[in-house]
Amino acid sequence: MKNRMIKVGTVVPRMKVANVTYNTAQIIQTMNENADAGFLVYPELCLTGYTCGDLFGQFPLLDAVEEGLFKIANASNKLEGLTVVVGAPLRFENHLYNCAVYISEGVIVAVVPKINLPTYSEFYESRWFTSGKNIVSQTIQLGDEFIPFGRNILACDSRSGAIVGLDICEDLWVPDKPSTHACLAGANIIANLSASDEMIGKQDYRRTMVLQQSASCYCAYLYVSSATDESSTDLVFSGHSMIACNGRLLTDSIFPEDTKVETVVIDLESIEKNRRHQTTFDLEENHDDYVYVDVSIKPISNQDEITVDELVDALRKEGYAVNRNPFVPVDDEERGRRCMKILEIQANGLATRVRSTGIKNLVIGISGGLDSTLALLVCHQARKLVPDIHIIGYTLPSHGNTTSYTYNNALDLMRALDVEMHEVAIEEGVQAHLKQIGHPGSYQGDGDTTYENAQARMRTYILMDVANMANGLVVGTGDLSELALGWCTYNGDHMSMYAVNASVPKTLVQYICRTYAYICNQEDLKEVLLKICNTPISPELTPHDENGKIAQRTEDKIGKYDLNDFFLYYVLRYGYSPEKIMVLALTAYPELEKEKVREAMLRFFKRFFNQQFKRSCLPDGPKVGSVTLSPRGDWRMPSDASAELWLEQVKKA
């Protein structure tokens, strides 16, 4: 498989103001110590220090800078596949420019001048430097070499697909950022060489800007600022360094006590997918004005083509973190906020449907399982928005299949939420129907879908009819994971009048219910919610065991929901190949053998493709996240599509 994962890093080296020899040695040392990376970025004017002041006009300092650059280039000659960007003051046509210099495998590749020079408050850059806004497609002489020089340079590596553009400090703070144009011209990595002094509130503001730029430009953004070795005559510099990708903060470090290097592995395919999906992300119309220079930025393991096992080993070695439950935030506080926001979206969607139809009675079947519990919580929250909503709950037990545990949980839940309660036992109706069609009437063993589906359809049949009697809406309970796998009965639990859980994955359903349990301030409700969260997932369509316990467990049939949701996320959110998803799964679940993951993935893709016909006629329901399967919105797939391409890749991975 093509390897488009690269290790990048920010470096805050030790530094002495105006001591170019020392600073050069520090840069070379950190390059050698991090030679396994593909790209490193250093602070603004790191060869001299940012706080040299009028010393920037001294020939000895500027001559030493050029010598230092060639020393760094010579040292990089043995560092295969590593590109670095360092900051240096350079002369050009009787002017001095604050520059970023690309160096790769022994060569000074290109020089980019700073465009936006701050000359306000504590900053006075235009005293020494000239803006590079008019420097386009020039060459600058360093020693005997003539090197591409201009604000319109992007550094490209054909192996990994990395394309690097630059901001230099203030460039991030202005409305028309150079990095925005660079990304529109194809850059997927932005390096910001900075020298930003520290003040109250500035750290948070910087972080916000870096995250926003990496999100709106769909790029990896590497920000690194000079540290406390700068002169403290009037200012203190904090060495703030950050790496963000697609709006997500990966590293964040400030006030290092010594040299500080932060490295991460970034996935260039994720950037490509986001840009391709966001059709308003248009490439710069005049990007032909850019000069593209070749550099070497190796993928991890320095392998262009890589096997699943090799990439998994490389990612584990780098400590590459993959969330086992990508729909669920790792941070407890963020997870709690996410869960309540989802519930808020669901409730508002349902409330809008109630207002628009004028129908205030909500009819819902309560099984004592997670999905119907969440749907009932949504109804309960919608009632807070539309106080004259009336909730009518039905238990629809089937003797021998419904356990007393789930049945009692359903009753306790409805009592706790002040729901009008009804019960209709379905066994007699199901038996009569099965007799009509010539079915024996009892469960005929694994594969007797007629027996199972007759119960699901009977429940829907009853709910629809009682909704008509009550002039009500049937609220659907099925979740996103079930829809992805087709784990629902066509025209049974598949159908409703408004499906509130349709874009909530199973791995999140439990967290929402559990979160609500702890914030509801109602002890009886908390108790039953936690019981339900700890109940095995089952449709209870087959007889329970001899002890009255649940025998039919959903995950025994379709695999663990953790893995299924993992596959679903990366198929829909990023469109990754089965090989890539297997790599991520094995990285996230190191305890699993590859063959177990392969088996689960084969089952997932088979079901995902052959069950599309159920998703092609889904009821309305609110979108709550970036991954959803509505045939009217985010997922428009033909029901007749073949899974062979995906299955073959899974088998070969």
Regions found by a protein language model. Name each.
Residues 56, 160, 217-219, 231, ...:
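ATP/NTP-dependent adenylation/nucleotidyl-transfer catalytic domains that generate, transfer
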Residues 1-365, 381-386:
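Enzyme catalytic cores with a strong preference for nitrogen-chemistry domains
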